[in-house]
Amino acid sequence: MSCQSPIVVALDYPTMAQSIEMAKRLDPEQCRVKVGKELFTTAGPVILDELHKLGFEIFLDLKFHDIPNTVANAVCVAAKAGVWMVNVHASGGRRMMEASANALQKLPDNKTLLIAVTVLTSMDQSDLIEIGIDATPEQHVKRLAALAKSSGMDGVVCSAQESSMLSAELGKDFVLVTPGIRPAGSDQGDQKRIMTPVEAMAAGSHYLVMGRPITQANDPIAVLTQANADLGLMA
């Protein structure tokens, strides 16, 4: 049964054993899980198989950014591995994104969502200026998100602060995936643009990525259950 919750728990662990241990403390009916660079690099594709065996839908968060053919092949491999969602960097440009979208469309019965990363939530305007982009994060997100949609992406990763703007400009069916989500009162960590789950959904986000507030809690399933209850789910 497909997960009805918008919450995606980030399994940001250095070993497969730790990630599987945490996954076993969660409920695939209450969340999806995200596999990022550290975990995938140490564990390899086998981590996807193990999480699928536990019943989880997986967001493979590798942020591909390379020449069009390389990225197109990579997202196809991810889709064939059965991941629910995979992402690429919008800054890779139109040809890279179009090649990826077209490659997935050619796969029989493909259901993998293809999402573009806009501006990392750890970045602020000073970071953009340092890499030669004379724009606010909001302006650059808007530019990259529009490019992503016109290039065939299913949606983008963006901060909750940009969700309302993007939903209004690009349509409510354009999927918005929001990291930097933390329950009220949580430590901000290294995310500079954050919101609570309720605030993010109200702003137009479709999926909410949560990491340490759940994975470092004494009772992760209790925090997850409460977050879903706050959203009017599984109360």
From Swiss-Prot:
Keyword line: Decarboxylase, Lyase, Pyrimidine biosynthesis
Record gene name: pyrF
GO molecular-function terms, A-Z: orotidine-5'-phosphate decarboxylase activity
Subunit structure: Homodimer.
A GO term from the CC aspect: cytosol
Function field: Catalyzes the decarboxylation of orotidine 5'-monophosphate (OMP) to uridine 5'-monophosphate (UMP).
Active-site residues annotated for this sequence: K63
Alphabetical list of Gene3D superfamilies matching this protein: Aldolase class I (3.20.20.70)
Pathway: Pyrimidine metabolism; UMP biosynthesis via de novo pathway; UMP from orotate: step 2/2
Annotated organism of origin: Marinomonas sp. (strain MWYL1)
EC number: 4.1.1.23
SUPFAM superfamilies from the UniProt entry: Ribulose-phoshate binding barrel
Catalytic activity: orotidine 5'-phosphate + H(+) = UMP + CO2
Record family assignment: Belongs to the OMP decarboxylase family. Type 1 subfamily.
NCBIfam families associated with the record: PRK00230.1, pyrF
Protein name: Orotidine 5'-phosphate decarboxylase
